[in-house]
Amino acid sequence: MNHILLIILIFAALALIFGLLLGFAAIHFKVESDPIVDQLDALLPQTQCGQCGYPGCRPYAEAIANGDSINKCVPGGAQTIQNIADLMGVEPPSDDNELLMAPPKRVAFIHENLCIGCTKCIQACPVDAIIGAPKLMHTILRSECTGCDLCVDPCPTNCIEMIELPATPDRWKWDVETIPVRMVQ
């Protein structure tokens, strides 16, 4: 019985020593991150889609902080560009000099008759916009899909294609300056 108690005490002492060492290391060897990068990262949509040319939102936030253009986030859209411009204290790029023109909104579409239910697209989707179960057909939730195109390549049957969404009043780019509107007093 004494041996068991001794072993428990030794393990408790080791756990206490290692806990103190880890606590000391966490305090004294802490890596400080740039607060502007943290703020930029919080503004980005966190889809980790890679459409900006970076492997995720955090590396793109670091690139913006180092002077890269602020208009490469396609899923974030114009509102994200405006928020980043406000944070950085710069003017958002206008449509004429925009470095990366946002392509028309596209979403993934699964041809369900070709889907074998392998779940590779579900694993590749960064925003969980694909529902389905193994060995059953899968479906895309259009409202959740960001159009990142990451689900297309893993599909072994090529049953996923990117389709352009039709123009609707919700997504139409209204040019208010050319619409003849008269203010009624």
Swiss-Prot record:
It comes from the Bacteria. Its cofactor is [4Fe-4S] cluster. [4Fe-4S] cluster 3 binds at C125, C145, C148, C151. SUPFAM superfamilies: 4Fe-4S ferredoxins. One of its GO terms (cellular component) is plasma membrane. It is an enzyme of class 7 (translocase). One of its GO terms (molecular function) is 4 iron, 4 sulfur cluster binding. [4Fe-4S] cluster 1 binds at C49, C52, C57, C73. Keywords: 4Fe-4S, Cell inner membrane, Cell membrane, Electron transport, Iron, Iron-sulfur, Membrane, Metal-binding, Repeat, Translocase, Transport. Residues 32-90 form the 4Fe-4S domain. This is Ion-translocating oxidoreductase complex subunit B. It comes from Tolumonas auensis (strain DSM 9187 / NBRC 110442 / TA 4).
